[in-house]
UniProtKB/Swiss-Prot annotation:
GO cellular component entries: cation channel complex; dendrite membrane; plasma membrane
UniProt source species: Drosophila melanogaster
Family: Belongs to the insect chemoreceptor superfamily. Heteromeric odorant receptor channel (TC 1.A.69) family. Or49a subfamily.
Underlying gene: Or65c
Residue spans, topological domain Extracellular: 81-92, 170-222, 301-312, 407-410
Subcellular location: Cell membrane
PANTHER family: ODORANT RECEPTOR (PTHR21137), ODORANT RECEPTOR 19A-RELATED (PTHR21137:SF35)
Function summary: Odorant receptor which mediates acceptance or avoidance behavior, depending on its substrates. The odorant receptor repertoire encodes a large collection of odor stimuli that vary widely in identity, intensity, and duration. May form a complex with Orco to form odorant-sensing units, providing sensitive and prolonged odorant signaling and calcium permeability.
Note: The atypical heteromeric and topological design of the odorant receptors appears to be an insect-specific solution for odor recognition, making the OR/Orco complex an attractive target for the development of highly selective insect repellents to disrupt olfactory-mediated host-seeking behaviors of insect disease vectors. Odor-evoked OR currents are independent of known G-protein-coupled second messenger pathways.
TM spans (from-to): 60-80, 93-113, 149-169, 223-243, 280-300, 313-333, 386-406
Pfam families from the UniProt entry: 7tm_6
UniProt keyword annotations, A-Z: Cell membrane, Membrane, Olfaction, Receptor, Sensory transduction, Transducer, Transmembrane, Transmembrane helix
Protein name as it appears in the record: Putative odorant receptor 65c
Lineage, top ranks: Eukaryota, Metazoa, Ecdysozoa, Arthropoda, Hexapoda
UniProt signal peptide: none
GO annotation, biological process: detection of chemical stimulus involved in sensory perception of smell; signal transduction
């Protein structure tokens, strides 16, 4: 596909999202998951076996891995220049942790790209989840809300991404003693502008490209990951709607029995997709929990260490807010998934009518009620699930460690 086609493929989510927002009667043909996948394909970094069979894709994926590896290793080597300066070393470590998170995701989905695509295909196959035909439930309000939420999240991320990239690639112009967007060191001092101006210019462009490409891809994979769980939450809402309108849609015992049997399978399909999703994202969920924990701890520790320097405190305060915001977002959607899943048993109980139905119908509803009492969770076993209760526990743990470290430093 040509460059113009890929650009259109990338911005299509924002174009369709804006049209959808402006026109309440408009219904999107796809979920947000589809659009995020299209953006990753437009960047040539949707790492599935099918994509790798396309011209130049496999070579590009290999080149991306080499770029990420070189960038990460040179950033690690750059720490040797910061030894003795606690603030600079803390800043270097923070960027290394952040870039390691990006590189880990790139490596991880080289292995799990096909399984990720299986989840996406399953969600797109069943979207919008509701049974079609006479008596179909009106799911459009819920669908519009979730799609609009995804659109505004994507738009806000895009704005902040552009601002962050602009600040990062121009930082050598306004940050004292910084000569590259990312502090890094190369052999033979190739990064020193005064000694090797040509190689310095090349490294500057290399880092600028990496910053733009990898951060944009990170937003896409994060958006895809979040949207998958949001789509599962939407499926739960559709299931609840169909349960609550069961007797309005079904007339006669046979039709009722067939429908309750379908709803049992519908519920089981949601559980199966969620289990598969948790399995696919197992490594990344653990990694982002650990990365956020370290970034929050590091930023607070460095801010306390340099508390007499307002500029340094402001830098690490922003870093802390970014880490907390990222963790809060995942905790919110994890909570939303769990809370909505608990309404399944309530909806099934409302569908129970002793006057109508048969023994088979009651058995199906009881099965849904029993299964629905266990909340569906976003989790990477054996670690705790993503919700605000565990989020608070992580913050308390950070506070305890920092208190101990500060007392030790004093």
């Amino acid at each position: 596909m040509d460059i113009r086609g890929n650009v259109h493929r990338f911005v299509k989510f924002y174009i369709d999202g804006w049209k959808h927002f402006r026109d309440p009667t408009m219904e999107s043909s796809y979920s947000a998951v589809y659009y995020w996948r299209e953006q990753m394909k437009a960047m040539f970094l949707y790492t599935t076996s099918k994509e790798r069979q396309m011209p130049y894709r496999s070579s590009w994926h290999t080149l991306v891995i080499i770029q990420a590896t070189v960038c990460f290793l040179t950033m690690c080597y750059g720490v040797t220049e910061s030894l003795g300066d606690k603030v600079q070393m803390g800043r270097d470590i923070a960027f290394i942790i952040g870039f390691f998170y990006i590189a880990f995701k790139i490596y991880y989905f080289q292995w799990y790209g096909d399984e990720l695509d299986e989840v996406v295909e399953a969600l797109e196959t069943f979207h919008p989840w509701a049974q079609k035909g006479p008596g179909a439930v009106d799911y459009r309000t819920a669908k519009r809300w979730y799609f609009t939420l995804a659109f505004f999240l994507a738009s806000s991320w895009l704005v902040f991404l552009c601002i962050f990239i602009l600040l990062l690639i121009t930082s050598p112009l306004w940050v004292h003693q910084q000569i590259l967007p990312l502090h890094a060191a190369f052999p033979f001092q190739w990064h020193e502008k005064s000694i090797h101006p040509i190689s310095h210019a090349f490294i500057y462009l290399f880092q600028t490209w990496n910053v733009m490409y990898f951060l944009t891809w990170l937003v896409c994979i994060e958006g895809l990951s979040v949207s998958i769980y949001v789509e599962i939450t939407f499926a739960i809402e559709v299931l609840c709607l169909e349960l609550r309108h069961l007797h309005q849609r079904c007339h006669g015992y046979e039709q009722l029995r067939l429908e309750t049997n379908r709803l049992v399978q519908f519920h089981q399909k949601i559980v199966h997709i969620l289990d598969h999703t948790n399995k696919v994202f197992h490594g990344t969920l653990i990694m982002q929990m650990g990365v956020n924990f370290f970034l929050v701890s590091l930023s607070v520790l460095e801010a306390m260490e340099a508390r007499k320097d307002p500029k340094v405190v402001a830098q690490f305060a922003v870093l802390m807010l970014l880490a907390l915001g990222h963790l809060s977002m995942w905790s919110y959607f994890g909570d939303l998934l769990s809370q909505k899943s608990l309404t399944i048993s309530e909806a099934a109980y409302e569908a129970y009518d002793p006057i109508k139905g048969s023994k088979d119908v009651y058995r199906d509803l009881c099965l849904i009620i029993r299964r629905g009492q266990e909340p569906l969770i976003m989790r990477a076993s054996p670690f705790p699930s993503f919700n605000f209760i565990n989020y608070s526990a992580i913050l308390n743990q950070c506070y305890g460690i920092l208190t101990f470290l500060l007392k030790t430093l004093d």
